[in-house]
């Protein structure tokens, strides 16, 4: 039996519509599958680390990874709790994220542990001693593992030189830090060794939580002429309490990060945290675009800043040498 031409045409059109619809659905499904999941884990909220995160997100956008379009960021904060950092990292692995950006040493260590035996790439930032923290074996070559990142070895010796230059009656320096943070311990050991080699005495005041920072500061009153705090997440998260004790007793505070200087510390030679985040994003983008994380060599942070807070110094009667002011990259009035 011959099918009338009109019926044949209708049947052909129907087949085309069904086929086209199927292809459209398949194309839509493929597009959805291209949305990458990136876990972002930050150990604690404070301005310096928030700048790391902001720099990362801004640079990821410049690299072509737009949140909600081709990538979805799952941003988590462990609120200074190592156990929560581990839980967050484990959840990222369970969610089968495509990559993890870890901000700070504790978060990076948790991510490294959680991703063992997987191929999930981890990029770390805001880590002072990546080798000492057990994240990588060498700074000079690609890791050959799923982990790489930006290490920001603090210029501790230069920071101590700055303390010596700015505090004329310096004899003893107080060091406040969390002994549970590997990066802090590394920097404190360097500071202690350098200060003692120059003939100065060191008074340590370790803490286990941010609640102990004020008491640690109080314990140094009358015993030191200056206090130094490295890039320590625990101590910096309680900066206001620390500053109150030191300012009331006319003791200058020197820190390892620039954001703390903006908040009331006297001075630092610190890392540019925003640029650190951007640098980490560029590394992660390379991995997402096809490079293996184990073939991406760890990088040292690119930018450092000498920052002085004139108002903070004036409040405690500390006169800043003209030689220091003249070479400052940024002065807070």
Residue locations for each model-derived region?
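Hydrophobic helical h-region of N-terminal Sec-dependent signal peptides
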Residues: 12-16
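C-terminal motif of bacterial Sec signal peptides marking the signal peptidase cleavage site
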Residues: 18-22
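Short hydrophobic alpha-helices and adjacent helix-cap/hinge residues
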Residues: 2-11, 23-333
């Amino acid at each position: 039996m011959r099918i009338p031409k009109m019926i044949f045409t209708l049947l052909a059109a129907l087949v085309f519509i069904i086929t086209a619809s199927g292809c459209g659905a398949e194309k839509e499904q493929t597009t959805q599958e291209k949305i990458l999941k990136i876990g972002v884990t930050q150990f604690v909220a404070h301005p310096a680390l928030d700048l790391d995160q902001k720099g990362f997100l801004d640079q990821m956008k410049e690299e072509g990874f737009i949140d909600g379009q081709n990538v979805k960021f799952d941003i988590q904060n462990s609120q200074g709790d190592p156990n929560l950092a581990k839980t967050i990292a484990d959840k990222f692995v369970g969610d089968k994220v495509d990559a993890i950006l870890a901000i700070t040493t504790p978060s990076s260590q948790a991510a490294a542990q959680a991703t063992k035996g997987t191929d999930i790439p981890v990029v770390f930032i805001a880590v002072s001693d990546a080798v000492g923290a057990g994240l990588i074996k060498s700074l000079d070559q690609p890791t050959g593992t799923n982990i790489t990142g930006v290490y920001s070895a603090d210029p501790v010796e230069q920071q101590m030189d700055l303390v010596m230059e700015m505090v004329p009656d310096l004899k003893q320096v107080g060091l406040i830090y969390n002994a549970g943070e590997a990066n802090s311990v590394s920097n404190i050991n360097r500071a202690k060794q350098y200060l003692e080699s120059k003939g100065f005495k060191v008074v340590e005041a370790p803490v286990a939580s941010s609640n102990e920072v004020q008491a640690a500061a109080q314990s140094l009153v009358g015993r030191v002429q200056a206090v130094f705090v490295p890039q320590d997440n625990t101590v910096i998260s309680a900066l206001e309490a620390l500053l109150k004790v030191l300012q009331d007793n006319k003791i200058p505070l020197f820190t390892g990060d620039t954001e703390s200087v903006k908040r009331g510390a006297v001075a630092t030679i610190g890392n540019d945290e925003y640029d650190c985040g951007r640098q980490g994003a560029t590394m992660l983008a390379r991995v997402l675009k096809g490079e293996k994380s184990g073939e991406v060599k760890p990088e040292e942070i690119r930018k450092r800043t000498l920052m002085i807070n004139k108002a903070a110094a004036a409040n405690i009667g500390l006169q800043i040498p003209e030689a220091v002011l003249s070479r400052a990259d940024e002065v807070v009035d």
